[in-house]
């Protein structure tokens, strides 16, 4: 009788520990994520634009690729969540037409739509990621 009760308690304790570990993993990914809080745009001479993304911590190095037709720059930010109120950000005239910010799974993708593909530079300074297009 005592042995059966001990086995039942041991199984309940193991189940409780497994549940706690599972919940901790689920919640830790959202707690540890860097959050994009704001995005700003500055027009520069020579039909260039500087995009400044502001985060609640130091952002990760972006990984990205470009597409020639239609002209796009896509930057992936692993482990980043977006707190921006809008996904679409029209830029008006000039080569860079719009910026779209989309959260998908464990990353956020930033897409710069352009009239014509040009090179870009990205740099991190404090809690900001600057992209010069």
Describe every region a protein language model picked out.
Residues 2, 6-12, 31-133:
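Signal-peptide-cleaved, periplasmic/extracellular N-terminal interaction regions immediately downstream
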């Amino acid at each position: 009788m005592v042995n059966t009760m001990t086995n039942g308690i041991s199984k309940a304790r193991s189940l409780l520990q497994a549940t706690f570990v599972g919940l901790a993993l689920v919640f830790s990914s959202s707690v540890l994520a860097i959050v994009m809080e704001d995005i700003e745009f500055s027009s520069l001479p020579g039909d260039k634009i500087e995009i400044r993304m502001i985060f609640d911590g130091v952002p990760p190095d972006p990984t990205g690729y470009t597409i020639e037709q239609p002209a796009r720059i896509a930057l992936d930010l692993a482990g980043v969540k977006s707190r921006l109120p809008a996904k679409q950000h029209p830029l008006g005239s000039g080569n860079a037409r719009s910026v779209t910010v989309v959260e998908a799974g464990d990353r956020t993708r930033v897409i710069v739509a352009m009239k014509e593909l040009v090179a870009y530079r990205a740099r991190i300074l404090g809690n900001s990621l600057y992209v010069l297009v």
